[in-house]
Amino acid sequence: MLKRVFKLFQIARKLSTSGAIDTINQVHQIPISINLFFSLISIGSKNTSLRNNNPGQNLCEALQGMGTTFIKLGQFLATRPDIIGEEMAKDLEKLQDKVPAFELYEAKKVIKKEIGEIQYQNIIEIGEPIAAASIAQVHFAKIKNENQEKQVAIKILRPDIEQLFNEELDALMLFAYIVENTISKAKRLKLVEVVHLLREITNIEMDLRFEAAAANELYENTKLDKGFNVPKI
C-alpha cells in the first residue's frame, strides 16, 4: 500500500508539473480540493511552455512527455468524447505513440532471457531498432534456420514495461477510487472505469501472442492472393 501511495505522489507531481492538470481544468472544472492538492505538490516546478497552444494540444504534449502509461491513457481517452468532450478527443487522436528506442544491448538481454541461451545461439546478428513505440520496438535480425540464414524482424517489449505499467496503473486506480468516493461531482468523470479499461486493453496489447495469432490468420487468409504478402510469424 505504501508503495502505491509513493507512486501516486510521483504521478501526481508529473501530472501537475507537466501542465496536464491545468489543461484538464480548462475543459472540466476540477474540484477545489483536488486542485489544491496538485498546486501544493508542484510548487516551484510547473511547466509553462505549453500555454500558447489550445487545451487539446497542451494535453497531447504533456502526456507524450510522461511515458508509456500516459500515452496509452491519452489514446484511450481519444475514444471517449463522452468523458473529455469532442474537441479534446479529436486533439488526442494526434497523440503519437513514439518514444526513444532503448539500447541494442538491452534488446539482446531481453531476447536471451526470453528464449534461453541455446536458442539465442541461432541468432547470427541483430540490427539497431528500426521502429520504437511506447510498449515495444522492432529490430531486423539474421538467424540460422535449418542450416540456412534467414532474415527476420523481432518485436521486443521494453525492459520491465509490464511492471512499470501495472505499478503506475495501481497508483492511478487508488487515486481514481479515492476521488470517486470522496467527491460526488467527480463521479461523472468515471475515473475508475477509465483506469480499469485502460489496464485491460494495454495488457492485451503487451501480450504479443495475440498480435502473432492475428498476423498468422491474416497470412492464411491471403496466402493465395497475388501481389499481397504477409510475413509468417
What are these regions (language model features)?
Residues 211:
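Hydrophobic alpha-helical positions that pack around
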Residues 140, 150-157:
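Glycine-rich ATP phosphate-binding loop
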Residues 1-137, 163-191, 195, 199-202:
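N-terminal accessory/targeting segments that precede structured cores
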Residues 187, 220-233:
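Conserved HxN/HPN-centered segment at the entrance to the catalytic loop
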Residues 136-145:
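Conserved ATP phosphate-binding architecture of protein kinases
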Residues 63, 69, 214, 218-225:
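Conserved kinase catalytic-core helix
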Residues 115, 214-215, 229-232:
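Core mixed alpha/beta domains of very large multi-subunit molecular machines
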